[in-house]
């Protein structure tokens, strides 16, 4: 259960650029477009056992919403939305159904975590997927250069251990990048400029929220 106030918005990754900071240094930033999020549900300790606020974004046609979803949005008094997210926060009672949350939820200099789905790479070998060194290029290596090597002895252990790093589908997984800084906020255009790279492709959905492990600056 959350014991702190958490701010968050759903947005779309537009791409990367760079800008000058206050110390005249070039800083790479990712631009996130934040369409107004609306509050569609408020969870309380009395009813749900915890406090949280549910946000939704990207309006869709009424005919595209399932009956349960349409009823849910109708109860909140808003048009159906494509994406929803729930944030556990101690100040959920301060929100109201239908309230809009914009990029102004964050101020310049705020520390945030960004959650997104990484780019899918398809089926990848162990060198690309896990960074294996591979087998030698010479000294008798015969068509084994990119193979993983032994994954378990014949008699001992006589099996492959769970979690063995092997080839397989790479990417397209939920990932959180922590402790990024909001370099600038353009409230008029609904843009957040966040230091560094964030997960996902251009046009991908991301969740920007208050950092859970923000570094405390020593005096």
From Swiss-Prot:
GO MF annotation list:
rRNA binding; structural constituent of ribosome
Q: Could you tell me which Gene3D superfamilies the record lists for this protein?
A: 3.30.160.810, Translation factors
Query: Pfam families this protein is in?
Result: Ribosomal_L3 (PF00297)
Q: Which domain of life is it from?
A: Bacteria
Q: Where is this region: Disordered?
A: 136-156
Transmembrane ranges, per UniProt, are: none
Instruction: List, in alphabetical order, the GO biological process terms annotated in this UniProt record.
Output: translation
Q: Does the keyword Ribosomal protein apply?
A: yes
* Coiled-coil region: none
Alphabetized, the UniProt keywords read:
Ribonucleoprotein, Ribosomal protein, RNA-binding, rRNA-binding
Q: Which GO terms describe its cellular component?
A: cytosolic large ribosomal subunit
Subunit organization: Part of the 50S ribosomal subunit. Forms a cluster with proteins L14 and L19.
Instruction: Say which family it is in.
Output: Belongs to the universal ribosomal protein uL3 family.
NCBIfam families in the cross-refs: L3_bact
Instruction: Give the function comment from the record.
Output: One of the primary rRNA binding proteins, it binds directly near the 3'-end of the 23S rRNA, where it nucleates assembly of the 50S subunit.
User: What is the protein name for this chain?
Assistant: Large ribosomal subunit protein uL3
Query: What organism, scientifically named, is this protein from?
Result: Kineococcus radiotolerans (strain ATCC BAA-149 / DSM 14245 / SRS30216)
- Taxonomy of the source species: Bacteria, Bacillati, Actinomycetota, Actinomycetes, Kineosporiales
């Amino acid at each position: 259960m959350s014991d702190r106030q958490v701010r968050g918005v759903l947005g779309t990754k537009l791409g990367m650029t760079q800008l000058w900071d206050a110390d005249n240094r070039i800083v790479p930033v990712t631009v996130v477009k934040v369409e107004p999020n609306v509050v569609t549900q408020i969870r309380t300790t009395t009813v749900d056992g915890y406090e949280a606020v549910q946000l939704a974004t990207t309006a869709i046609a009424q005919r595209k919403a399932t009956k349960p979803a349409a009823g849910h949005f109708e109860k909140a008094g808003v048009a159906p939305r494509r994406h929803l997210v729930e944030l556990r926060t101690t100040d959920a009672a301060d929100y109201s159904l239908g309230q809009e949350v914009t990029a102004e939820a964050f101020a310049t200099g705020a520390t945030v975590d960004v959650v997104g789905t990484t780019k899918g790479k398809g089926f990848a070998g162990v060198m690309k997927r896990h960074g294996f060194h591979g087998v030698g290029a010479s000294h008798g290596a015969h068509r084994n250069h990119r193979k993983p090597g032994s994954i378990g002895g014949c008699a001992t252990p006589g099996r492959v251990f769970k979690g063995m790093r092997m080839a397989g589908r790479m990417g397209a997984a939920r990932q959180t990048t922590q402790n990024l800084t909001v370099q600038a906020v353009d409230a008029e255009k609904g843009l957040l400029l966040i230091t560094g790279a964030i997960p996902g492709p251009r046009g991908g959905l991301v969740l920007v929220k208050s950092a859970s492990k923000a570094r405390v600056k020593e005096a």
